[in-house]
Amino acid sequence: MTAILTWNIQCGLGCDGVVDLARIARLARSMGDADVLSLQEVARNDPAIAGGADQVAELQALFPDHQAFFGAGLSRRAAGRARREFGNLLLSRLPVLQLFCHLL
């Protein structure tokens, strides 16, 4: 059976006001061994969120047995920096044959 976990991680922000993606990964694993994780509100290069961390890369490193696919719902140019992005991250240990991103 395929196990799927979907979660709005709110950029990793906990109830204690601390951004901790390792804690998110631990909690996700405690809920079961998900083959596919669909994470909403993941940020990349936004200085207002976790000091501009690349949360996509961090989460991918925390789930090394999963492939990462990121779809930015918001993508803004930033002077002298990588694009500031905010969106959804799909982590899959199963093969992904097709992937579509639909902007709403």
Region locations from a protein language model:
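Ligand-binding beta-strand-loop-alpha-helix segment within the catalytic cores
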Residues: 91
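Active-site catalytic loop in hydrolytic enzyme cores
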Residues: 94-104
